[in-house]
Amino acid sequence: MTAVRISTGIRASRNQAIVDIKISLCHLSSMELMLTQLRACAEPTRLRLLALMALGDFCVVELTDILGQSQPRLSRHLRLLVEAGLLERTREGSNAWFSLAQTGLGRDLPAKLPAIDATLQADRRQAERVLAERARAATERFRRDGAEWDEMRALGLPAETVEAALVADVETLSLPEGATLLDIGTGTGRILELLAPFIGSGLGIDASRTMLALARSRLSRARLRHCSVRQADMMRLPLPDASFDLTILHMVLHHSETPGAVITEAARMLKPGGTLLIVDLAAHERQDLTRALHHRWPGFSDAEMRRALTSAGLQAIPAATISGPIDIAIWRAIRPAGTTPAAFTLKAASIHD
């Protein structure tokens, strides 16, 4: 077997290092990859870290609190686990967040560890304390920032009915086994929680750290380890083309300056044959609500949305409408098989052009 050097050297940028690591791992045979990963986790602290990640995402500061070890020591262990493809690392401001890999040994190994082990049980108790503190802090920050309001409730909309309609729509899709979901503008992570039973892995994107903190707490409470969240700009998603089977924009577009461009970026994420679902306000004339809730757009007509979806290279399907004080529409569009992101156009800067 060929020896493969995984470390990328100190001169590489952090992002380039992660790319180089993934490229190196792709060139390993199945046997070489397993040996590399087994060597990486064959150490007590690293096994403890993997067991903890089954409870959710953690940052380094939280892990030092849970395990009682120094940050430099834990950072080295985490780096080795990331290099071996057992953990994934994402940056959010000054914090680095770590989660289990969504496939392979990283995903499967924690379930094989002895749940009755005294050390692992103690770690779980400490982790539950940290997660509870995180949830309290997130809720307090939510209140302090003046953001504790539910837009659906403020609009007098039937949230439960809308969610039931979304689930019913997803149930009609022929999603592949282990389907991948991207929730753009995830907010508190409710859509990830709602659709978790239908997917193999889910990723929520949001620009707000406050919302991400709430989403992480929600996912941790629900034990949804196959779902995670990441800070990113929905106009410039730091993700490869054609990565997801299902992409969702839930009550996002009426806040966006350029909803057409957001749709185009969401379309870029879809695998051939993948589906984009958009839940948003139908066109309305309630200017009082538009001003009070700082909406950028007074909903969207079916013609406007179909035009934007077509401009993004998608095949639009007739929308379903949910009646209320303001109607809610669920639009569905499919990326045709055989198309590539190069076939998409970026001219749809605004749906209302």
Model-derived regions: residue spans:
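N-terminal helix-turn-helix DNA-binding core of bacterial DNA-binding proteins
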Residues: 32-72, 96-103, 165-167
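Amphipathic alpha-helical dimerization/coiled-coil segments
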Residues: 16-21, 25-30, 105-153
